[in-house]
């Protein structure tokens, strides 16, 4: 249909043509670029005044541009929605809609989004922002940075979301290209502090060869479907990578992920209580969107074992035939250590900040050294292979679950939350959000 020279020139100009067409349309038709920018400015002022925390693409782009404007990934025509965290999403949705109506805008609507506990704002049929619930204990201590005079979620906290994509091949890889490109640029601007690798830490009560630690490995983990992360997995990876002896860490407790949480909890509790005295456990609520429910086992008041549920993910693993054990892949281990690192920041636990910060930097260093030594890449089969598909468990497709939930509500005569301002301050419905504080359950 086209000469090769014409095909090449068209392909070269497609991005420019799309951009010019979009800008041309918005200069003439509703909602105009002038209106859109005006609404965005009002929303940003609302976020500033209430000291809310911006996350997602808008925050990533703003933080990148703060370091180097030329590296930003949004074009003027992209009109990215602004996502922000709040401990009061319904209140903020109602108040923001009321404020925009008072400013004279039309067709204003706030309503539940696809993702649980997230609400969207539409003005003149354009989607402007996502308002997401964050438990107050996390919101008040969430690490942030400033850009555009707004509180932006810290890059290392947002990085957890990237690793949630990387470790979820079944339901999240449709986001992989966009996520990897953006976060690779973001982390070049805000890398981890390499000096954390030198952190020295010791657990006062640690005994490397203690009886209960060996029992857990041999009688609970070996030949099970539990996937090991944390200290034990870190040391196993370091040994296989032939990392320096100084990289090895004390392992006072073992961490695993379960695909059958309640049944595994019963089995493990019976085994530990049947073989050791003074055993008890504590249950914890999920930690935000990042961790599912968890349980910690204690012996003589010392933490010995922590188990997470799989948080509706198919858990990626690397199997050790020698140890008959499923270990988390490098990327899965990195994500769980990253979550614990940020949880320590939220809880102001300086010891765990030091521990997990050091584990993260050591993991990156040992990986890079190993790959250079053996002339490999992260895509090659081996202990540091990334983006793998072998996993344990049944994943949950959030979009599908949202559609099914909508159907179920409709059948029960229930409806999703929708708010349209009517000239008077709106009534804010009382809604109890799930407990995702990450704190111990009474």
Please tell me what each predicted stretch does.
Residues 37-42, 106, 116-117, 210-215, ...:
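Short alpha-helical segments and helix-capping/turn motifs at coil-helix boundaries
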Residues 36-90, 212-262:
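Active-site nucleotide-donor binding segment shared across nucleotidyl transfer reactions
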Residues 1-38, 146-211, 398, 419-428, ...:
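N-terminal regions immediately upstream of nucleotidyltransferase
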Residues 246, 301, 322-324, 424-425, ...:
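Intrinsic-disorder/low-complexity loop/linker signature
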Residues 350-358, 363-439:
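Eukaryotic intrinsically disordered, low-complexity regulatory regions enriched in Ser/Thr/Pro
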Residues 90-97, 262-269:
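Short, conserved charged micro-motifs
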Residues 97-140, 270-315:
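Conserved catalytic core of two-metal-ion nucleotidyltransferases
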Residues 106-109, 115-118, 124, 139-192, ...:
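Non-catalytic nucleic-acid-binding/docking modules located in mid-to-C-terminal regions
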